[in-house]
Structures are given as structure tokens and as C-alpha cells.
Amino acid sequence: MPYSHGKKLKPSLKLAKTISTSSFVSSTTSNSFSPLEDSTSASSSTSSSSSGKSVRFAAHLYTVKKFNTKLAPISISEKAASNLTRNLHNNAIPLTFPFIGGEDHRYSLDILDYSDLEYDNKDVEYDNESDVEDNAMLMHDRSMFIEKEILCFGEEETFDMADWKLVSNNLNPFKSDYKVDVTGLEDKIFKYLNGQNIKVHSLELSDPVSYEDICSNNFGNCQIWGLIFVNNLNFEKKIEIKFTLNNWADIHYINAHYNKSVTPHVDEFKFIIDISALKLNLISKNLIYTNFFERKTTCLLNLQFCCRYDVNGFEYRSFYDNNDYKNYEITISLSAINLNRAVSNSSIFNSNLGPSKMGASNAEVTMSKNNENSKKPLRKFIKDTDYYNDSPLKHKFYQSFETKAACKTEPVSQTFKAETIDCEIEPFNYFFEPPDSQTNEDMSDSSYDLSLQDFNYWEFSNHGLGKALADSDILQFKNYPKPEPFSRPPIIDDTFTLNTDDRTLGSKTQKLEDNLAKEWKSAKTRTTLNETPLHDDEHRTSFTYTTWNNSTDTLMKRKEERPVESASCSQLSIATIKAEEDLLYQDYINSGRESSSPEISPLNTTTSLPFFPGDNMSDSSGEYEERTSLSPNKIHIFRDYFYKSPSP
């Protein structure tokens, strides 16, 4: 027993000590340890020490959930609460819900990914320069699907019902006899009722509307008229008709109204079921529909109904008429008229696509072709446009060295003269356009292939003699990883002799300038060709070229060698040039320097054509001449002037 200053403790303190100890023991034996329990036990011990009350805690404590009074009443179980995800901050998703007073909702079920709903308006932008004829068939096919979707969703539902008629019903109609008196008529009606207080005795269908009436905007309503005999039990009566059109999946209610009093004890009520008023509902349930390829579609409707008779004076009793537990059934046949058939959306889509014809089935769609001889307008660029292309496939789409040259020959007794037309290279203008004639196709330079293999030689092939001369300065490139700037464009004067099977052409290029003005503008080429006969099989030819280009790298492409073609006035070939630099230098030393512009003569010796670098020149003037020869069908080139600075 503890003492305090030699005195005994008060009984209240003893009790508090005992209770706090027992509560501590009970809390330690429990399975749950939480700061909430410790704080609660501590506060209870202090309060018990002052008041002397005993407090007992449960073995398991639960966290108290607090809800805002403005929140919607939602019951959340422990299992559902564990599946809720924290609503992360997103600018696209509002953090407050307006229907709960603007309070923040801490939890939300992530059902939709709102990031998928975001779109860019740029996706709907179209190129104004696109070709309309290319998308003609696509737009024509899509028009049919668009109209079908419009009819399915009812956004532009433009069809009506016509030509309806009553096919069958299971009603046993009442046959009246006008010769009998009122007493006899009443007896006959009660006999027809067969102990019932309500019974349908007549069903009729409204007058149908024909297709011609609808075309003249004379619309009608498809209605079912019914007459009911009612036993006059009380003055206050209520008769309700319950009907369905899809075997009681959907139920509709209408009221019958007083029509007349047949006898003092029998009244007649009348009801109307308007089928036309339920048109949208029938469309949504696919009970009536239209075929897009037909003017009208026949649909069958099966209507079932029964009646209820409520009487006020008989303790609100209700009487039913369900046709002896069989319900009343009516089968109606009607025609759904497609009003879109007159003015179809396809005529709007295909108004600019030429005449078209659409068959009775969606499998047959015939469209007239455009005139094959008519040329489509292509995109054109201005002549001074710079073309820079860094694409790996640039050699397939860029043809800056594609020129058209037409050979115009004039037969003369002593002098033969041929002059090529002035041509300017306009990329993409003739990329898709076929040649006008066979002559243009022959003279137009086709493929221009230039590839570098191990930086030792070039493979150069062309189908035009003039183009090879114009671009001969490209052959200077070898072992130049990066072109260095030069002071002025080099002037190259070339003289060569071409040996072929049938004749030899000797030509001398007099003024070949590679003008690169202002960072190598787009390529332009001007060509003049003059030939004069020297001997029977030899002609003297002179070319004058002026060209500049900035896209030499776009013409580099590794390609196999092409065989040398037979020479002609319209189609010539240049053989593949392969040489090693060391052989060039050795041949250059052995051959020696000669005077420029020697006399042109055919060469029959066969030697490898050297490569012409500008770095191996030691003369101060920078001029020398190389005399080389090839076997027949190959080129012999004499090069006269070179500058040390490489040409790009």
C-alpha cells in the first residue's frame, strides 16, 4: 500500500487507481492499439479520479465518420469505401458538384477517363488544295451510312405512315337490329354482356392516307376507334384502356369518354388509340422502320388491350374486360413512306462529282469516270523557291535535276543543226504528269543516280547526254567530307569524244558555268546544242550550259550500274565512271601537260577513265588537260580547266 507523506490515500484515490489499472489491463488485452484509445483512457482516468465514475471501453473501437449535412444521402459500406479512389487534381475535371451545393466531394468513382474526351480542333481541318476527284467515291459511300444513322437516331426522321388497314382482330362484334324496340335492344345487349358490366362491341380503323396524299402534304392519323357497352351502375364512371404494342413490354393507358346512352340501363363509351402519336416510340423500338432504297416499307403492328371499369357507388369496385382472359388483339398493316427519297442527302454530297447512279441494293454503286484526257491541277511553286529536304527518302521525291528537252532537227545538205529548247527545272510540276508525246518522253531525263561507295569512286548514270555535261562538275567530289567555301564559281571547259556503234559525236563544251549565287538557289538550266558534220561518222557538237543548284546531296543514291544504251539523237547513255585517285595521279604524271582545246578526234584505245580532283593540281594557273579513252559505247572526256576549290 503506497503512502504519501506518511498518510493513507483517500478511498476515492484508491478507487481511481484500481479502475485506471483495470482499464489499462483491459485495453492491453484488446487487439487494437490506437492513439485514440490511449488519449481516451488517459482522459477517463483523470475524470474518474475527480468524479469517481467507472468507465468501460469496448474491445474494438471504430473511427467515427462525419458527413456534411448538405451532402446527398449515400450509404457507404466498408467494402465499398475500400474501393473508392481519391479524386486527384485535374484541371479538366471540376472538384465541386453543383447539385450538392458546391461542396467538395472527397471521393469519386473513376468511371470515365476524361482525357479521352479531349480533342484538338486541328484534327477537323482539311487541306483546301486537296483533290476533290480522289475522294469522290469515299464521299459517295459515306453518304449512305450517314443517312442510315440519321434515321436510326431519329435526328432527322422524315418519313410518315400511310396505307394502313386492319388485318385481323379477335373481337366478337355486336350485331344490332334496328327493327326491335328499346326493351328488346336492352335485353339483347345484356345477353351480349353475358353477366359482365363492361364489354367492347366495336373496333374500327380510321380512313387510310395514300402515298399521293402524303406527297401533296395531306397527312393523316392512324387511329383505332372503339365502342364499349357499360352497365349503368352509377352516375360517376371511369373507364380506362390499357394497351401494348410489344407484348406488354411497354404499357400505355388512355381513358374512354362518354358517347351516348343506349338504354336507361346501358351507356356507351368511346376510346381512340392514336398510332401516329406513338410514331417516335415505335421508331425507337424498331416496330416501324423504313428501307432507304425503297419508297415505302410495309410494317405489321400487333396491338393488345383490355378495359377497366371503376364505379364510385360500389365501394370503389373495379370491373375488367379482357375478352374472356384472352385480351383483345388487333393486327394492323401500314406502310412507312420514306420522305428522304425525294430529296436525298446523297445528291448534296455528289452534286460536284459528276453523274452517278445508285442501284436498288447497296452492293451496286456505279459512278461515271472523269475524262481521262483531262489533266488535274497540280500544286506549283514559284521559280525562285529554295528547296531544303532532310528526309531520308528525299531521293525518291526530289527531282531538281529533272529537265525536259525536245530535240528539234532540221535536215540540211551540208550542215546538221540541232538545238534543245530552253528549260527551267520546276520540281514536282512533272512528277505526276505524263509526257505529252513520245519525243518528250525520250528526251526528258529520267533517273539521275549518284552514289558513293567507300569514298573511292562514283557511279554516275543518266539517260541524257546534255544533263551529264551540265552536271559534270559533280564528279569533282571525292574524299571531301564537307565542302569548303570558294571565292567564285569555277569555269569548266570540257572536250570529249563519244564512240558508239553507228557514229561518233565529238563535242566541246565552251561555257559551262556553275553559278551558285547566294547560297545555291534552286536549279535552272539553259541548253544550246549545235552540231556540224566533220566526217561520215563524226560530228562536232558544242553545248552551252548555265546551271546552279543547291541540292546536290538529294541526288545521291546507291544504285546498280545501268547498261550503256545505243546512241541516238534523242536517247544517249553515259557509262559508269570508276577510277581510283592514285591511278589518276599516275596517269596525270605520265600523260603530261598539253595545250588546251586540242583538235577533236575519235579515240580507239581503252583506258580507265580517271577521276578529276582539284587538290592534285600544282600549276599556278590551275589549268591542265586529261586525255583518256574508253572502249566503244563509252565516253572519252578531255577536261581543260579546273580550279583547286571544289564545286558543290
Swiss-Prot record:
Keywords: Glycogen biosynthesis
Residue ranges occupied by any CBM21 domain in the UniProt entry: 201-331
A Pfam family that the UniProt record links to this protein: CBM_21
Residue stretches of biased makeup (Polar residues): 593-609
Domain of life: Eukaryota
Gene Ontology cellular component list: protein phosphatase type 1 complex
Function text: Regulates the activity of glycogen synthase. It is most probably a regulatory subunit for protein phosphatase type 1.
Bias-annotated ranges (Low complexity): 20-51
Presence of keyword Flavoprotein: no
MF term (GO), any: glycogen binding
Native organism: Saccharomyces cerevisiae (strain ATCC 204508 / S288c)
Stretches the record annotates as Disordered: 20-52, 593-629
GO biological process: glycogen biosynthetic process; regulation of glycogen biosynthetic process
The protein's name: Serine/threonine-protein phosphatase 1 regulatory subunit PIG1
